[in-house]
């Protein structure tokens, strides 16, 4: 259950009281008490002060998912949020923009080569170090994000997903691997690059789906076609892909 802090002696209490009287049991075992949404200066929003932001206008301008992503990754749900429309613009440009560019990069070269993820999976030990590093980071991310969601920490989960997407996939892997997609022949190295990037994008779509359900669903359908991401299996980390030493050495 989730409600504002003002409902501590209202809705929260009423549900427990009624459930105990009728069913002799508590109504819920986990509760999130939402903080207040303030203006960018930390003042309470009000029509009188003229500092209120129209949520429907923001959704119309940026979309529901960028707005939700900004609010969840900016502060924990139980903390007060200083809302700044510039922050929504930044999230749209950096995270969603980078993610869209990365998908477009993959789609462009895949269409040119007629590539589909139908070929046999290239074994991990036969992939270049760059690919093994990224897959190690991806599987570490899966474990961390799963733990965050299970502990009701969506803010940490969103920040981890965003950092991986922007820093490791877009700014690092794609930039350093561009030439691998240029060759005419479908070499094992090129195949590995395709499979690695595809796997990352597909997994990102699944991991981000609780926070950005519409964008994640579109990304997943564009990649895999067919059913919704919300009907897919939640990704499971492969410990055999995780190489902590490789991750540390690449971080240096």
Describe the residue ranges of each PLM region.
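Structured secondary-structure scaffolds
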Residues: 1-112, 134-177, 181-182, 195-208
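Acidic, turn-prone loop/beta-hairpin segments
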Residues: 113-143, 174-252
């Amino acid at each position: 259950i989730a409600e504002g802090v003002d409902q501590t002696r209202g809705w929260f209490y009423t549900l427990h009281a009624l459930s105990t009287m009728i069913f002799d049991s508590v109504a819920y075992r986990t509760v999130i008490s939402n903080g207040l949404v303030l203006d960018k200066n930390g003042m309470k929003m009000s029509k009188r002060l003229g500092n209120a932001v129209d949520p429907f206008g923001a959704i119309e301008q940026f979309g529901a998912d960028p707005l939700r992503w900004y609010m969840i990754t900016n502060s924990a749900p139980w903390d007060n949020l200083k809302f700044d429309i510039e922050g929504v613009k930044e999230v749209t440009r950096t995270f969603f923009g980078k993610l869209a560019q990365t998908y477009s990069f993959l789609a462009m070269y895949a269409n040119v080569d007629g590539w589909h993820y139908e070929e046999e999976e290239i074994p991990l030990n036969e992939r270049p170090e760059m690919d093994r590093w990224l897959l190690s980071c991806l599987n570490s991310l899966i474990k961390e994000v799963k733990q965050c969601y299970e502990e009701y920490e969506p803010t940490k989960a969103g920040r981890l997903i965003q950092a991986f997407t922007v820093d490791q996939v877009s700014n690092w892997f794609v930039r350093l691997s561009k030439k691998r997609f240029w060759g005419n022949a479908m070499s094992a190295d090129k195949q590995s690059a395709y499979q690695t990037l595809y796997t990352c994008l597909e997994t990102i779509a699944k991991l981000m789906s609780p926070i950005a359900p519409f964008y994640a669903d579109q990304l997943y359908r564009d990649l895999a076609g067919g059913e919704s991401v919300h009907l897919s299996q939640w990704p499971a980390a492969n410990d055999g892909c995780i190489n902590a030493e490789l991750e540390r050495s690449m971080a240096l």
